[in-house]
Structure formats: C-alpha cells, structure tokens
Amino acid sequence: MRLARRRARVRWDEVRKEMNAHGVSVVEIQKGANGEWEMLNNGQNRRITAFTEMEITGPARGSELLVTAFSPNATRTRGTLNNCGSGFTPWGTYLISEENWAGYFHPDASIDPVPRELARYSVSGWQGNFWYDAQEGGIVTSDDNFSRFLTAATGADASEDFRNEPNNFGWLGGVRPV
C-alpha cells in the first residue's frame, strides 16, 4: 500500500526539486570587521547536486565497474546525494564523503536474488524513493537523469544502460577549486 501511494506522486518536477535539494554547498566566508561572518561573492560559491557532472580521477578512472550509458569510458559521472563528513586536508583539498545513497537505487525486479554486486551495497529492495520512475504528464520520461536510478541490465552491455550506476556513489570526493 505504501508503495502505491508513493508512486502515484512521482512527477518529474517533484523529483527534480528533490534531486536539486541533495548534495553539498560550497560557500566561501570571512569574518567581517564587525566580527560577523559574511559570504564572499567571488565565483567559487556553488551547489553540487545529484545533477552535477563530475570527472572521475585516480585509480578508479576507466574501471569497467564505472561504465554507464552516460560515460561508456568511465571517466565522468553525475551527482552526489547525502554527504556527512567534510573538511579540508592539511594540503588544502576539500573532501566530501557520501553515505546513505543505496536506497535511491532499485534493482531489476525480474532478478531474484539481487546480484551480489548490488546486494553488498544494500541495493536490494524497493524501499526509498522512486526517482527512476519520474513522469511528466503521466508519461515516463526518457531523461536518464531519472532512469539511471533503476539498475536493470537493459542493454547489450554496461555502456548501454545503468547497471553500474550505484558504483558511482558512496565515494570520498575532492572538490576543486575551493
């Protein structure tokens, strides 16, 4: 019953608002002459949301586990969802850490049991939201910003669908420039 009620409200405009509300804010501040903190308007301030395109760097770049229809060569990804700890390293890199992201993804309902690769991340049920099923005017959109949250293997390989999309979340990320 809960599933049916929630799914009835999945509209693309609501989902877009939810996705923009997730992420992290980067804001530069300074202490003013009066002792109050103030935001600096210097072009560095921004939101990093579920839609933000990012470059994959380091040893994971190009990994077959990160291949998706969005990035067949596994060099780019999109978004960050729930960030808990963040802060600066001694060398000045701003780090964000992502948690509690698994409930945003839904496995292929026709596969039982859920593949080990998804189950180990708790991407194993139909709990959470239904971003993958966003509808515009009652029609499921083809916008892969939404469908990427359904991890079904619908293509000939991972470069044609989003079966690997969960692997693009849950990372410790560096934000540049700060």
Task: Please describe what each predicted stretch is.
Residues 1-178:
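Conserved small-residue
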